[in-house]
Amino acid sequence: MKRRSLLSMIPAASALLALRSNGAPITKPTLNDAGFAVSVQCWSFKEFTLFQAIEMAAAAGASGVEVYKGQKLGGDHGDVTFGPEIADDKLQAIIEHLKKNNIVALNFGVVDVPKDEAKARQIFEIAKKLNLYGITTESLGSLDILEKLAKEYNIKVCFHNHPKPTSLWNPENTLKSLEGRHENIGFCADIGHLASSALDPLTVVKKIAPRIHSFHLKDRASLTEWTHDQPFGTGVIDIPGILDEARKAGFAGNVSIEYEHNWKTNLPEVAQCVGYLKAYSKLRA
């Protein structure tokens, strides 16, 4: 396995939240110089509380987080977990903790969105209260209600791929279902899961780039089978090429680092990934 150097491949919470309306384009200082946001999927820190995950994302140098349903808040809130049913006072505590750490909540997922409009609307309401950019889901069967609410709330819907044999394992198949749909409907391209499904991530991204709203970005040792996550630039996935292709198609969304390895001690590795993306951003500015 060859380590790749970025340089060899080349010819930035309410104060922050107030900079954009819910679902509107992400703006500076959350956007980096290359025009996208760098966040950490809180699932990377699933062994910790949400408050700790926010602190760890900040320590790693990220500008945002992607929250998921079921993580304990921690602190004075004990075993209370995050989700669409969370009480307003708990939600306000999260917002204040984000602000304290100069972190923006950008996406919520991966979350199931039901066809029932009232229940689906509850998810969009929590996204609105958190001023989120997008909702990450695999509920393709709820596409009609997702499209309706994505337009109403001006929030991106990002269809995520888990590995084969899950239903959305191949984004090229999902793309057919998105033809003619509103521009807020698109993808959260999980790069590591593409590799686990023996799909070349760069090839897939080239085909779906105009619909990509967010990433779950990973580096791996193989493009044909499951291998564990590792710091960006130490594996075989062409991360600069993937980001270049997305940016060519106008990508200005959320790049969420999802690091599913060394669960209790992965902060230094997540920080390496953030640093890699910062270097990419500077070189592409």
Regions found by a protein language model. Name each.
Residues I10-L16, L91, H97-G186, A195-A198, ...:
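Active-site acidic/histidine proton-transfer and metal-coordination neighborhood
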Residues A24, G75-D76, D116, I145, ...:
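Short secondary-structure boundary/hinge segments and terminal tails
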Residues V67-Q92:
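Glycine-rich, proline-tolerant flexible connector loops at the mouths of alpha/beta enzymes
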Residues D76-V80, I103-G109, E258:
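Glycine-/proline-rich flexible loop or hinge segments
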